[in-house]
């Protein structure tokens, strides 16, 4: 049978790889997309003994569902590596779907991707690698990087004590995904590889095409896996939370209309309010106890500070004094300068921090992550309260 260019590329790929004398073992998380596919291929090329691992999170369409399982299995067959599927639907239901639902019920706007990374993906991957005993590392297709603490010596690091491993932004500023990884631990970082960390997205696609990977031309997912699965977050919310009628109130006290549940609103929202007012109005805050959506002019959305809870310090020891940071309060937003101040409890332990922005910020949204950087280094992050 006549060989295709794809077959020849893969043959050359494996031929060069087989010259490697000593191999290390690594588990690669595979979603069925081009990023994780190329990560696996590059690790094979670099001499790792690779096994693909796909987590079955939900039934249905999408990269986290049945479609992704099929694509991941086919890729592993092409690369000649083992592929394992773990049924993670129960833990995903408990740690992501349930907690996302609870967060919306409290009037927060949650970040399901961070929940999944912290409590599902990396935990399941690490546990599986440990169970294999001879597998020392794990890898994903995230656009982020890891370095050792010596990297930080070039920075102004007043009041910062760095841990052994540092989490860094990806080299591609437009694709950097470190924001979603602030909850990782040193144990995970010590075993983790990001093969795409130094690459740009266009290079990823080009390299996948060169190698003839079956996922090379697969469209990039533009939404959360929950959106892919349910069709929209509104459908997800309607399926999991009962409607509860309440009032939409201007911050001046005037009742402007009704709503069918605070879970349908987020701070800064303008569209879909269903109210009439001479000037555009935006969601200012959500009162869960009174079931009220407060709205205001855009100028009223700005905050000078925020309280950050459940902070995880991934790259540094917990600071005992105030520190200067660049804070990112939503994905895709530019980091802004701020001062982070520890708030001590009566027993002198720290559970929350006050973030004071150098310049007031609009739509600081409870439930979203505030992630702290020093240059390229992700120091830590927590939830906006």
From Swiss-Prot:
Extract one GO BP annotation from the record.
Answer: tRNA wobble position uridine thiolation
What are the TM regions of this chain, as residue ranges? none
> Which residues are annotated as active site?
116, 225
Question: Ribosomal protein: is it a keyword of this entry?
Answer: no
InterPro entries reported for this sequence: MnmA-like, MnmA-like_C, MnmA-like_central, MnmA-like_central_sf, Rossmann-like_a/b/a_fold
Q: Supply the alphabetized keyword list.
A: ATP-binding, Cytoplasm, Disulfide bond, Nucleotide-binding, RNA-binding, Transferase, tRNA processing, tRNA-binding
- List the SUPFAM superfamilies hit by this protein, alphabetically: Adenine nucleotide alpha hydrolases-like
Q: Mind telling me which Pfam families this protein's record contains?
A: tRNA_Me_trans (PF03054), tRNA_Me_trans_C (PF20258), tRNA_Me_trans_M (PF20259)
Compartment(s) of residence: Cytoplasm
Q: Which reaction does it catalyse?
A: S-sulfanyl-L-cysteinyl-[protein] + uridine(34) in tRNA + AH2 + ATP = 2-thiouridine(34) in tRNA + L-cysteinyl-[protein] + A + AMP + diphosphate + H(+)
What would you give as a GO molecular function for this chain, any one? tRNA-uridine 2-sulfurtransferase activity
Query: What does this gene product do?
Result: Catalyzes the 2-thiolation of uridine at the wobble position (U34) of tRNA, leading to the formation of s(2)U34.
- Give the protein name, as stated in the record: tRNA-specific 2-thiouridylase MnmA
Name the source organism. Answer: Prochlorococcus marinus (strain AS9601)
Q: Gene that codes for this?
A: mnmA
């Amino acid at each position: 049978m006549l060989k295709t260019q794809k077959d020849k590329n893969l043959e050359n790929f494996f031929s060069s790889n087989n010259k490697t004398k000593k191999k290390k073992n690594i588990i690669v998380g595979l979603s069925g997309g081009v990023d994780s596919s190329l990560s696996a291929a590059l690790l094979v090329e670099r001499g790792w003994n690779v096994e693909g691992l796909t987590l079955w999170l939900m039934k249905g369409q999408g990269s986290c569902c049945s479609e992704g399982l099929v694509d991941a299995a086919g890729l592993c067959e092409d690369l000649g590596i083992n592929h394992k599927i773990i049924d993670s639907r129960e833990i995903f239901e408990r740690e992501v779907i349930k907690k996302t639902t609870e967060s919306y019920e409290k009037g927060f706007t949650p970040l399901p991707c961070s929940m999944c990374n912290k409590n599902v993906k990396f935990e399941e991957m690490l546990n599986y690698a440990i169970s294999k005993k001879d597998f020392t590392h794990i890898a994903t297709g995230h656009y982020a990087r890891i370095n050792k603490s010596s990297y930080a010596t070039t920075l102004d690091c007043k009041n910062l004590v760095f841990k052994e491993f540092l989490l860094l932004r990806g080299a591609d500023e437009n694709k950097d995904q470190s924001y979603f990884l602030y909850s990782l631990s040193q144990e995970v970082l010590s075993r983790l590889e990001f093969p795409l960390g130094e690459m740009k997205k266009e290079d990823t696609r080009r390299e996948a095409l060169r190698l003839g990977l079956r996922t090379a031309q697969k469209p990039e997912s533009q939404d959360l896996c929950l959106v892919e699965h349910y069709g929209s977050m509104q459908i997800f919310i309607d399926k999991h939370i009962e409607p509860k009628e309440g009032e939409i109130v201007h911050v001046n006290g005037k009742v402007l209309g009704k709503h069918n549940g605070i879970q349908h609103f987020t701070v800064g929202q303008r569209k879909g309010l269903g109210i009439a007012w001479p000037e555009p109005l935006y969601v200012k805050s959500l009162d869960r106890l009174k079931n009220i959506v407060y709205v205001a002019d855009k100028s009223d959305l700005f905050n000078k500070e925020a309280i950050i809870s459940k902070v995880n310090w991934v790259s540094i020891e917990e600071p005992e004094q105030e520190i200067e940071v660049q804070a990112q309060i939503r994905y895709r937003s530019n980091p802004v300068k701020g001062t982070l101040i520890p708030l001590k409890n009566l027993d002198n332990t720290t559970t929350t921090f006050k973030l004071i922005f150098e310049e007031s910020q609009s739509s600081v949204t409870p439930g979203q992550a505030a992630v702290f950087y020093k240059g390229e280094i992700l120091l830590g992050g927590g939830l906006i309260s």
